[in-house]
Curated annotation (Swiss-Prot):
Subunit: Part of the 50S ribosomal subunit.
Keyword Transmembrane helix: no
Name of the encoding gene: rplM
TM segment ranges: none
This protein's name: Large ribosomal subunit protein uL13
GO molecular function: mRNA binding; structural constituent of ribosome
Organism name: Pseudomonas fluorescens (strain SBW25)
Length: 142
């Protein structure tokens, strides 16, 4: 008997919607990253994208514990000398509410082409409305 290996063309992908209101950033991100990889499925294969599509709504209402709202820093660099920019969690949520969740989940996915394909299945929206009603996403609670 041989080991089962999932084939990319036979993978069944479902759509799920997650409400991030009041959820802790890291705990939400670990569950979402695991589902994007497909680790919750019995046919999980590390080198095949077996994960589901995840739609996250109310991203602006995600929270962090302790003093991280003011202390947690996010950095980016333009590539030019002296081109480093930084902002804290509060500033990033005010400017781009989807960014903290996207950054947290992206850091938990594999680096490389497979991880980029997994990340493309994540859809994050600041408010409660999303344009994926046609896919009939199921509610997912953590």
């Amino acid at each position: 008997m041989t080991t089962f290996t999932a084939k990319p063309e036979t993978v069944q992908r479902d759509w799920f919607v997650v409400d991030a209101a009041g959820q802790t950033l890291g705990r939400l991100a670990t569950e979402v990253a695991s589902r994007l990889r497909g680790k919750h499925k019995p046919e999980y294969t590390p080198h095949v994208d077996t994960g589901d599509y995840i739609v996250i709504i109310n991203a602006e209402q995600v929270r962090v514990t302790g003093n991280k709202a003011s202390d947690k820093m996010y950095y980016r660099h333009s590539g030019f000398p002296g081109g480093i920019k930084s902002s804290n969690f509060e500033g990033l949520i005010a400017k781009k509410p989807e960014a903290p969740i996207e950054i947290a989940v992206k850091g938990m996915l594999p680096k490389g082409p497979l991880g980029r394909d997994m990340f493309r299945k994540l859809k994050v929206y600041a408010g409660a409305v999303h344009p994926h009603a046609a896919q009939q996403p199921q509610e997912l609670k953590f």
